[in-house]
Amino acid sequence: LSNFENYTKSASADSQFKLKNMMQQIVYLENSYPQLDSIWLYSSRDGLFITKYGCFTEEEFFQERYTLTTSAGRSLQDALDEQQPFSYLATMQVKSYYSNTECISFIRSVSGYSGQPDGQIILNVKSGTLTNILKKVSAGEDLTAVLLDQEGGAIASSREGFPTGE
């Protein structure tokens, strides 16, 4: 929490409470799943990455990603660069900025230098959303997954020929 107070001094009491709640959630997740050592949350309202190391602006987060280390002793950038498949971990209650909802967390599993497994939550999906997707898939409906940038523009798609970059 070293630089946490720097970012919350001027924030409203409500914002301070929510940011502290997010930090507590990270601590809870890390204590519950010690193999997950690259956990962070992003508060779009505040433009901050909340990590176990404190709060970072987007610029700071990406500058620091080479110096922040995971509990397995790797740099955060190593964890981000690791090319490993998705794996389903668990359903958990996630108290986020906007809701207290049951989420399905998909984890990218990696092994640290010490041989201890660790990982990174790369996608949290509300269980209701995932249920709807699975219903459509089982009904034979054609679905396309699209990755969007912050402005809502398509970056990548699971369907060949889907327009991106427009």
Predicted regions and their residues:
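Extracytoplasmic/periplasmic ligand-binding sensor regions of membrane-associated signaling proteins
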Residues: 31-124
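Extracellular/periplasmic ligand-binding regions of membrane signal-transduction receptors
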Residues: 1-21, 42-60
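GAF sensory domains
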Residues: 51-61, 153-166
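Well-ordered, non-membrane alpha-helical segments in soluble/globular domains
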Residues: 19-25, 69-74
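General structural signal for secondary-structure boundaries
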Residues: 1-3, 11, 64, 71-74, ...
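Secondary-structure transition/capping residues
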Residues: 2-5, 37, 141
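Solvent-exposed, extracytoplasmic
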Residues: 21-33, 112-162
